[in-house]
UniProtKB/Swiss-Prot annotation:
GO cellular component terms given for this protein: ribonucleoprotein complex; ribosome
UniProt similarity note: Belongs to the universal ribosomal protein uL24 family.
Record-given protein name: Large ribosomal subunit protein uL24
A Pfam family recorded for this sequence: ribosomal_L24
């Protein structure tokens, strides 16, 4: 099955602690059905000191389940994703809310 959410997409969080926040997907984990979104779902991690970096408590993004995020449409609202096959046989993603192509 083709991926409905891909790296580089602007998404909004639908459920959870960060509900309503938006960010850009920078990693998708299809086997886990999860994604990492920049600046969303931050958790504190204890990092051991190494020669390269300093130790301490750092904030980093935790994975969010794909069912809890949705792509932001051109109108700024969350939209579902569908697929459409163009005349030349290319499969493209479309926004169900507006019918506009997400990627061309």
């Amino acid at each position: 099955m083709a991926a409905k959410i891909r790296k580089g997409d602007k998404v909004i969080v639908l459920n959870g602690r960060d509900k309503g926040r938006t960010g850009e997907v920078f990693e998708v984990r299809p086997t886990e059905n999860k994604a990492l979104v920049r600046g969303v779902n931050l958790v504190k991690r204890h990092q051991k000191q190494t020669q390269a970096q300093e130790g301490g408590i750092i904030s980093k993004e935790a994975a969010i389940h794909l069912s809890n995020i949705a792509i932001v449409g051109k109108d700024g609202k969350p939209t579902r994703v569908g697929f459409k096959i163009q005349a030349d046989g290319k499969k493209v993603r479309i926004a169900k809310r507006s019918g506009a192509e997400i990627d061309g």
